[in-house]
Structure formats: C-alpha cells, structure tokens
C-alpha cells in the first residue's frame, strides 16, 4: 500500500521541482537582461 502513495508523491513533486527550476532560471535570465 506504500508504493502507490510514494508514486503519487513523486509524480506530484517532479513537475513542481521542474517548474521551480524553470522559474529560477527565467528570473536569473531576466535579471541579467536588465543589467546588460
């Protein structure tokens, strides 16, 4: 019964983690663009 829960957690966390990394990279890019 633990495996479906674990799979749900992983499937929930992976898109959130990717979205967080994408947003951080985009903010850094925009900040660099403003400075340049």
Swiss-Prot record:
A cellular-component GO term for this protein: cytochrome b6f complex
Main location: membrane
Subcellular location: Cellular thylakoid membrane
Pfam families: PetG
Gene Ontology terms for molecular function: electron transporter, transferring electrons within cytochrome b6/f complex of photosystem II activity
Membrane topology category: Single-pass membrane protein
Keywords from the UniProt entry: Electron transport, Membrane, Photosynthesis, Thylakoid, Transmembrane, Transmembrane helix, Transport
Transmembrane segments: 5-25
One BP term from GO: cytochrome complex assembly
Subunit structure: The 4 large subunits of the cytochrome b6-f complex are cytochrome b6, subunit IV (17 kDa polypeptide, PetD), cytochrome f and the Rieske protein, while the 4 small subunits are PetG, PetL, PetM and PetN. The complex functions as a dimer.
Family (UniProt): Belongs to the PetG family.
Protein role: Component of the cytochrome b6-f complex, which mediates electron transfer between photosystem II (PSII) and photosystem I (PSI), cyclic electron flow around PSI, and state transitions. PetG is required for either the stability or assembly of the cytochrome b6-f complex.
UniProt-recorded name of the protein: Cytochrome b6-f complex subunit 5
Protein source organism: Acaryochloris marina (strain MBIC 11017)
